[in-house]
Regions:
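Residue-identity detector for glycine
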Residues: 9, 319-323, 327-329, 384-387
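Secreted, propeptide-processed cysteine-rich mini-domains
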Residues: 110-112, 324-345
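Short, flexible beta-strand-to-coil junctions
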Residues: 12, 272-275, 351-357
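Cleavable N-terminal signal peptides of Sec/SRP-targeted secreted and luminal proteins
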Residues: 2-15
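Generic structural signal for beta-strand residues in well-ordered domains
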Residues: 5-8, 263, 298, 341
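Extracellular Cys-Trp
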Residues: 335, 341-376
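Catalytic-core signature of thiol
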Residues: 14-318, 362, 377-438
């Protein structure tokens, strides 16, 4: 009898607790532009409650030090995991069919421990595929943008791209049309509901468009509502001549090679397994999901690597925060004015410029500006300069990839996720990775 009364009490308490979430759910519908009525409202509210319970449970484990990342409500809060997975529309066709090359590491320019292309004016703001399964097109376009913007380095950018700026210094850059890739690749066969492959998107621009690519404003994204016409409306007469000639594969399953490729070739297009609830609601920290698959046949989402680093913080702070910036802050290193003192300070880098001399600062040579405001961009270092300094002392922190998603800035860390690196190719990050060639 007492047990029955206790269970009944739990049921009532649970109902009251769940009902307390109704205002939160109503706020969520308003924030995300959702409109539900009648039975559908109650159904979505039930799903929201279930997801809320998962989020609360996971974050309690994080507070107890049992997991390295947090989760939070986002645009998927009223979706079941099955509905969410339907948005993941990366296909897995053989990636080697049209590769023009395979990655060969530059042994003379080894990758530093931390690197991030975002401060260098190469990476566009995070975009949003919305309800269309077009992740593959966003991933492929990001790789082509990365190659183009890296080569131009803010100079000689075509007039069609005059409205685009990248990075904290508003570096002139180009932003290309994902809608063109969706509509034109394989004659429009890869619609929102059928998915596609990143390398096919690159080959569409190279082979069928002859290297010409419309900008985002010339050919705007219209498939966010979940539909695409499959009608190619590319306008080659006004498109940018990109100089993109193909794509290169990075060695399957080799995270060391992937790190070097990410350092040398800006944005890397990759496929991952993003099917878990934990990815659906990821908020901050290094994503470490043992249930993630690491085989190429189970990759279901296309994203882009824009850098990598080592997390040395004792525990991630919950909730979304600013975009990740590996290494100490800009003011941590300039006082180390000798090469010996700089190299002895973990996280600081000694870099030389032929016209100015050596300086110590908190990002790898070629990634930031020194305290005199002189840019040390890798591809601008003149002959005879020191180039990247030796890596700092090994850290006991967690290795991660800086991954740019295409679900808008409200997801994750302003649209980004730190994914585990050097952890048995977790989530298949190194299974299907390519970069654009110029």
């Amino acid at each position: 009898m007492k047990a029955t009364m206790f269970l009944a009490g739990l049921a009532v308490a649970s109902a009251i607790d769940n009902e307390d979430l109704r205002p939160s759910f109503i706020d969520w519908t308003s924030k995300h532009g959702k409109s539900y009525a009648g039975a559908e409202f109650e159904q979505r509210f039930q799903i929201y409650q279930s997801n809320h319970a998962y989020i609360s449970s996971h974050n309690a484990r994080h507070s107890a030090g049992l997991t390295s990342f947090t989760v939070a409500h986002n645009q998927f809060s009223a979706m079941t995991n099955r509905e969410y997975r339907n948005l993941l529309q990366k296909k897995n066709r053989p990636r080697s069919a049209g590769a023009a090359a395979s990655f060969v590491a530059d042994q003379a320019d080894p990758a530093p421990d931390n690197f991030d292309w975002r401060p260098l004016g190469v990476v566009n703001p995070v975009k949003n595929q919305a309800s269309c399964g077009s992740c593959w097109a966003f991933s492929a376009t990001a790789a082509m943008e990365g190659a183009f913007n890296q080569k131009h380095n803010g100079t000689g950018v075509p007039s069609q791209c005059s409205s685009y700026k990248c990075g904290p210094n508003d570096t002139p850059c180009c932003s290309f049309s994902e809608q063109e890739v969706v509509d034109c690749t394989l004659n429009g066969a890869d619609t929102c509901n059928k998915g596609g492959e990143m390398h096919d998107g690159v080959l569409e621009i190279v082979n069928n468009q002859k290297g010409k690519f419309n900008t985002e404003s010339q050919y705007p994204y219209t498939s966010g509502g979940g539909t695409s016409t499959g009608q190619c409306n590319a306008k080659p007469a006004t498109a940018v001549t990109t100089g993109i000639t193909g794509y290169a594969n990075v060695t399957h399953g080799d995270e060391k090679a992937l790190k070097q490729a990410a350092y040398e070739h800006a944005i890397i297009s990759i496929g991952i397994d993003a099917s878990q609830n934990s990815f659906q609601f990821y908020s901050s920290g290094v994503y470490d999901e043992p249930a993630c698959h690491n085989t190429i046949d189970q990759l279901d989402h296309g994203v882009a690597i824009v850098g990598y680093g080592i997390d040395t913080s004792p525990s991630p702070s919950p909730g979304p925060g600013p975009g990740p910036s590996p290494g100490p802050g800009p003011a941590d290193c300039p006082d180390q004015n000798t090469e010996k003192a700089c190299k002895a300070d973990t996280g600081c880098f000694w870099c030389n410029d032929p016209g100015i001399g050596g300086f110590c600062f908190s990002f790898p040579c070629g990634q930031e500006e020194n305290n005199h405001g002189t840019p040390f961009k890798r591809n601008l270092l003149t002959a005879g300069s020191a180039g990247p300094a030796p890596s700092p002392a090994p850290s006991t922190g967690t290795d991660y990839w800086i991954v740019r998603n295409s679900w808008g800035e409200s997801w994750g860390m302003n649209g980004y996720i730190w994914m585990s690196r050097n952890k048995d190719n977790q989530c298949g990050v190194a299974c299907d990775s390519i970069y654009a060639l110029m």
